[in-house]
C-alpha cells in the first residue's frame, strides 16, 4: 500500500495509485480534455491514475448502467493497490448505484472516497453503513480557475499531510468552537 496514516487520516504519497470514477451523471464528451488535463496534473505529481471505463455519458447523460457504475467503484475498493477514489461527476444519478454497493468491502478497504454534489448520497451511505469518513471535494477543481492554488492545497494535504485544502476563512456567529462528527454535504 502506498499511503501513510496520520492522526487517523490517510494520506497518499508518491507512487500512490488512485481511481477516478463517475457514479452520477456522465461527463459530456467535450469534458475529455479536462479529464486529460487532470490526469496529467496528477501523474506529474507522482500519482498513478486508473480511469473507470464509465466516465462519459450517452445522449441521456448516463455513463453506463447503475450496476456498471457501481461495479467500477467497487473494482477500485477491491484493488488493494488503490489508495483513494475520486468521483469526477455530479448531478442526480448517484443514488441509483447504492443498492449495488458492497459496504462490507468498502468498510474493509483503507481508502477514502472523494466526491461532490449528489455524491453526498454515497458519502453519507458509506458513513452510515461503515462508519468511515469520506471527503466532500471535486477533484476537477484542479483544472478550473485558481487551479494553481487548488493544486498546491490538494498536494500539500494529500501528499504532505497538511490541512490546507480544508482551511478556509470563517467566523463564529455564536460561540467560539465546535466539535463532533459532521454528516451531510451538498444534498
How would you name each of these model-derived features?
Residues 4-81:
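ATP/NTP phosphate-donor binding region
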Residues 60-64, 96-102:
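Metal-dependent catalytic neighborhoods of phosphoester/phosphodiester hydrolases
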Residues 76-78, 125-127, 133-134, 180:
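Hydrophobic structural segments
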Residues 82-88, 110-113:
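A short, small-residue-rich loop immediately preceding and capping a beta-strand
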Residues 86-95, 116:
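N-terminal glycine-rich "phosphate-gripper" loop used for MgATP/nucleotide binding
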Residues 101-125, 133-140:
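Short, acidic/small-residue loops that bind anionic groups at enzyme active sites
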Residues 132-187:
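Conserved anion/nucleotide-ligand pocket segment
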Amino acid at each position: 500500500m502506498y499511503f501513510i496514516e496520520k492522526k487517523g487520516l490517510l494520506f497518499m504519497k508518491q507512487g500512490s495509485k488512485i481511481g477516478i470514477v463517475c457514479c452520477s451523471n456522465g461527463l459530456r464528451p467535450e469534458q475529455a480534455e479536462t479529464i486529460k488535463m487532470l490526469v496529467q496534473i496528477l501523474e506529474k505529481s507522482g500519482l498513478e491514475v486508473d480511469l473507470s471505463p464509465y466516465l462519459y455519458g450517452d445522449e441521456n447523460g448516463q455513463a453506463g448502467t447503475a450496476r456498471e457504475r457501481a461495479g467500477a467503484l467497487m473494482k477500485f475498493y477491491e484493488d488493494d493497490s488503490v489508495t483513494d477514489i475520486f468521483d469526477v461527476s455530479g448531478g442526480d444519478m448517484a443514488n441509483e448505484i447504492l443498492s449495488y454497493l458492497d459496504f462490507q468491502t468498502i468498510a474493509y478497504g483503507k481508502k477514502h472516497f472523494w466526491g461532490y454534489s449528489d455524491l453526498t448520497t454515497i458519502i453519507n451511505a458509506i458513513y452510515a453503513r461503515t462508519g468511515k469518513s469520506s471527503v466532500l471535494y471535486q477533484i476537477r477543481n484542479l483544472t478550473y480557475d485558481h487551479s494553481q492554488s487548488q493544486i498546491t492545497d490538494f498536494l500539500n494535504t494529500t501528499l504532505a499531510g497538511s490541512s490546507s485544502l480544508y482551511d478556509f476563512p470563517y467566523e463564529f456567529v455564536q460561540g467560539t468552537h465546535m466539535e463532533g462528527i459532521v454528516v451531510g454535504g451538498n444534498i
